[in-house]
């Protein structure tokens, strides 16, 4: 491959404008074809920021790799809010259920350093702490302590055996 471009684009809504267009302009690839391929591959993420890598050759051929959106984007999408709290320890902007935390952990697990779903869930809970999002109405730090105490082993262990 002659070059690689890494960008963050809204799923299914990439366009030839920034950030993609200026990066692709000087390359030999057909910008519109790249945009169409990215939109086809990211349609399921519907507006959520998705990391995309475009690898291209001098002959104009290209390959696209779509990553998993950042954890914060998945949480925002799942909980339905735009920006996190300015005071995340005091002012909470949304609430997630245990099932929503599990779903996000399952989506992110391949990209995380966690060796199992329980630890992936704890990473998601850590991001909830930074954003000001509660889980089951509880402060995320307290929720993490309950995970550590084994209260949710049955929820997160089922996936490990599957």
UniProtKB/Swiss-Prot annotation:
**Record key words, sorted:** Ribonucleoprotein, Ribosomal protein, RNA-binding, rRNA-binding
Q: Which GO terms describe its biological process?
A: translation
Q: Which InterPro entries match?
A: Ribosomal_uL11, Ribosomal_uL11_C, Ribosomal_uL11_C_sf, Ribosomal_uL11_CS, Ribosomal_uL11_N, Ribosomal_uL11_N_sf
Region (Disordered) residue spans: 1-27
Pfam families per UniProt: Ribosomal_L11, Ribosomal_L11_N
- Give yes or no: UniProt keyword Plastid: no
Give the domain of life: Archaea
Coiled-coil regions in this chain?
A: none
Known SMART domains for this protein?
RL11
Q: Which PROSITE patterns match?
A: RIBOSOMAL_L11
User: Which Gene Ontology MF annotations are present?
Assistant: large ribosomal subunit rRNA binding; structural constituent of ribosome
What is the protein name given in its UniProt record?
Answer: Large ribosomal subunit protein uL11
Q: Which gene encodes it?
A: rpl11
């Amino acid at each position: 491959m002659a070059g690689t471009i890494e960008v963050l684009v809204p799923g299914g809504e990439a366009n030839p404008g920034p950030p993609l267009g200026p990066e692709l302009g000087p390359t030999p690839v057909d910008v519109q074809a790249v945009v169409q391929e990215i939109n086809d591959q990211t349609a399921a993420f519907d507006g959520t920021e998705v990391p995309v890598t475009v690898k291209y050759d001098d002959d104009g051929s290209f390959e696209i790799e779509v990553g998993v959106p950042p954890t914060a984007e998945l949480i925002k999408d799942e909980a339905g809010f735009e920006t996190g709290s300015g005071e995340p320890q005091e002012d909470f902007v949304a609430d997630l259920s245990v099932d929503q935390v599990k779903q996000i952990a399952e989506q992110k697990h391949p990209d995380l350093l966690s060796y199992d779903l329980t630890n992936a869930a704890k990473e998601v809970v850590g991001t909830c702490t930074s954003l000001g999002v509660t889980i089951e109405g509880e402060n995320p730090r307290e929720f993490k302590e309950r995970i550590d105490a084994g209260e949710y082993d049955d929820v997160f262990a089922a996936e490990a055996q599957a």
